[in-house]
C-alpha cells in the first residue's frame, strides 16, 4: 500500500489528523451569549447542551443548559448559580426572550437572534459588522468585549464611575483546544485573580471534561479554588 493512501486511511480511523483550518468558527450568537451569560462557547451544529460546574467536594456550583435551532439561535437558555442562589430561564418568542415561567419579556433581540437590550436594567448591546456583541451600555457602566479571528471571546473591560475591571483571556495556540486558556483579572491595573482551564475535546473540538482553577489574588495569601466541568452536547 502506498504511504499517502495509508496515511489517509489512518487519518480517517484516528480522530486527530483533521486540518485545523476546517474547524468551524464560533458564531456571533454563541460567542456573545457565552460572554454575557458566563459559559464556555461551543462550535458546530449544536442542538442542545449542558455545562455543569462542580466543586472539588463534588457539589454542583453552577449549571447552564440550552437548546439551539439549526440556524444557531438559542431557543431556550437556563442558568442556575447555586453558590449565589440565582437563576434564569429564557425562551425565544419572536424578537424577545421571555421568562420561561412568568412569560415576561426579558431580553429584546436584533438581527436574526442577537442580544439588543435588557429594558428592565436599562442595558443596550451594540454589535460590529460581523454581528458580534462588542459593547453593552447601562446607566452607570459600559462593557467592551473582545474576540479573536475565529470569534473566540478574549475578555472584556467593564468601566463605571469608580473602577475599571478587565479580564484578559489567552487561549491555547492549538486551534482545536481553544478552551484550554489562561485569564487574568485586573481592577484599575492591579491584578486580583487568574484562571487556568484545560479540557478533553470531542470531534468538533468542543470541550467534554474540563479542569478549572480560579485563584483569588485579592486576599493574602492567595486562595485557589478547584472545579471540574462536565459537558453534554448533542448535535444535529
From Swiss-Prot:
Lineage, top-rank taxon, reads Bacteria
Q: Where is the signal peptide?
A: 1-16
The subcellular location is: Cell membrane
The cross-references to InterPro entries, in alphabetical order and at most eight, read: UPF0257
- Does the record's keyword annotation contain Lyase? no
Q: Which UniProt keywords apply?
A: Cell membrane, Lipoprotein, Membrane, Palmitate, Signal
Primary location: membrane
Membrane-traversing stretches = none
Quote the residue positions with lipidation, kind S-diacylglycerol cysteine. Answer: 17
Q: Does the keyword Lipoprotein apply?
A: yes
Membrane topology term reads: Lipid-anchor
One GO cellular component, as annotated: plasma membrane
Q: Where is the lipid attached (N-palmitoyl cysteine)?
A: 17
Similarity remark: Belongs to the UPF0257 family.
Kindly provide the name given to this protein in its UniProt entry: UPF0257 lipoprotein YnfC
Q: Which organism is it from?
A: Salmonella dublin (strain CT_02021853)
Q: Report which gene this protein is encoded by.
A: ynfC
